[in-house]
Design a protein with these regions (language model features):
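A short, Lys/Arg-rich alpha-helix, primarily the initiator
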Residues: 1-28
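Short alpha-helical DNA-recognition segment
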Residues: 28-48
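DNA major-groove recognition helix of helix-turn-helix/homeodomain DNA-binding modules
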Residues: 57-74
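Amphipathic alpha-helical segments of tetratricopeptide repeats
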Residues: 106-113, 146-154, 187-194, 225-236, ...
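Alpha-solenoid helical repeat architecture
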Residues: 116-122, 156-163, 195-206, 234-246, ...
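Tandem amphipathic alpha-helical repeat scaffolds
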Residues: 84-95, 123-137, 163-177, 201-215, ...
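Short C-terminal boundary/hinge segments that cap the last helix of small helical domains
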Residues: 69-85
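Helix-turn-helix repeat elements of alpha-solenoid scaffolds
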Residues: 93-108, 133-149, 173-188, 214-226, ...
Length: 434
């Protein structure tokens, strides 16, 4: 085997050149045999070059450039340039400096012609994926960029691979139904980056909401503590505010409502309420906590404050009518639903319709709509709202003395508390296995 020249540590053992030409051959739809014959090279030797097992002899890169009609530059200049940039960009992401993050990414993408013909090709495409996930969200482009990186992991160092997994985690975390996919990527990221503060910090932080949303609130609470410790060392106090906020939500999910209300109120008192853009989210969390704690007047108060401050959350649509229902203010409840139903998100309409049907003793409509909504919660892994609905269903079957259904919903409640309730395991759906 030819002697391998010593190269900088962050490129050692990376297959930058071989992977580049391998990728080109594959996208051109050419077989290894065809290319080897066309350039009069041994097939096994060409395979070794493509897979980083041999150095490229003098003249071979030019030979392949001519064959593919490319202008590949194998110097490390552009790779090193991008390596420095990706660290700066990720640091901006970790510090919530979205303006700088986007500005740097757009500057790099403006030099596509340079980077795509250099040793920085794969790192450039990783940064392109970074931009797509953070600022474009075109699913087709994201999947194409993801496949390109996944097919050439031998050209990505472990630190950049951890960034790849982290941004994929961010992408899949946006939809509750893919939270478990996001968790897998964040864990992969942490396995590679435990000693890289920025990456470990962001991954740990992102896992908080995943655990909270997937009925693992105690674990989410412990990750709040882990995350706070890392961000404190980084002196990233902005993110520490969010950690405190998430910890309040964990307390709510654990049923520690008074502790959550106290902590949320302290956070509210410690910020400038006239300018803070997250004030509506905090009102929302307080409204939700009061709803679960059966303090319905307070729930209505903070729901209205959240709406007045333009909180975008769709689930607010049922806080007020449900509170009216529980307070036996049935006319107010029906009037509210009638005037707001057409503006509600389709996901929550069955719940609103079930409340209306329950008041009017339209039992068939109630059962149809509440089961449809419960099924949607399970199907989309929206675990946070499940206990409220389970108790709503239990109250109904208790009132109608349907012992078979009481047993079924009690089994589901136990499964939820045991952390193993899924759409498939739920006892309420005859067709749950389909």
């Amino acid at each position: 085997m030819p002697y391998k020249h010593k190269i900088p540590i962050y490129t050692e053992n990376l297959n930058l050149t071989g992977a580049y030409f391998r990728h080109q051959r594959i996208i051109d739809g050419l077989s290894l045999t065809y290319v080897a014959d066309a350039i009069s090279m041994n097939k096994g030797f060409l395979s070794d070059l493509e897979n980083g097992k041999r150095n490229f002899p003098d003249g071979t890169i030019n030979q392949l450039n001519d064959f593919y009609n490319l202008k590949f530059d194998d110097s490390l200049k552009f790779y090193i340039e991008l390596e420095n940039n990706i660290d700066e960009i990720f640091h901006a992401l970790c510090n919530s400096n979205t303006f700088k993050e986007k500005q740097l990414l757009e500057l790099i993408l403006s030099k596509r012609d340079i980077y795509e013909n250099s040793s920085g090709f794969f790192l450039f495409n990783l940064l392109n994926l970074f931009y797509l996930i953070r600022f474009n969200c075109n699913e087709t482009f994201i999947n194409d960029a993801k496949k390109l990186i996944e097919s050439n992991l031998d050209a990505i160092n472990s630190k950049d691979l951890s960034i790849f997994y982290c941004i994929l985690g961010i992408y899949y975390k946006r939809n509750p139904s893919t939270n478990f996919v996001a968790e897998k990527y964040f864990k992969k990221c942490l396995s590679l980056s435990s000693n890289i503060p920025d990456i470990a910090a962001l991954c740990t932080f992102e896992l908080i909401s995943i655990y909270a949303e997937t009925n693992r609130s105690a674990l989410a609470y412990t990750y709040c503590e882990k995350s706070r410790s890392i961000f404190n060392r980084l002196q990233n106090y902005t993110t520490m505010f969010f950690i405190d906020f998430f910890q309040c939500n964990c307390l709510t999910n654990l049923g520690l409502y008074e502790s959550s209300i106290q902590k949320l109120t302290e956070l509210l008192n410690n910020i400038d309420q006239s300018s803070n853009k997250y004030i509506s989210t905090m009102y929302h969390s307080l409204a939700w906590c009061y709803l679960l704690n059966c303090q319905y007047s307070e729930c209505i108060k903070y729901t209205n404050l959240a709406i007045e401050n333009k909180d975008p959350s769709c689930d607010l649509c049922y806080f007020i009518p449900y509170s009216y229902y529980k307070q036996k203010e049935y006319l107010k409840c029906l009037d509210y639903i009638e005037s707001h139903l057409e503006y509600a998100d389709d996901f929550y309409k069955p719940f609103l319709q079930s409340i209306s049907a329950r008041i009017q003793k339209q039992y068939v409509d109630f059962e149809k709509n509440i089961i449809l909504y419960y099924q949607s919660l399970l199907q989309n892994n929206v675990y946070e709202g499940i206990p409220l609905i389970q108790n709503f269903i239990l109250d109904y079957y208790t009132e109608t003395n349907n012992k078979d259904m009481i047993i079924k919903i009690l089994i589901d409640i136990k499964s939820f508390n045991d952390k193993d309730l899924t759409l498939k395991s739920s006892t309420l759906f005859v067709d749950s296995s389909s």
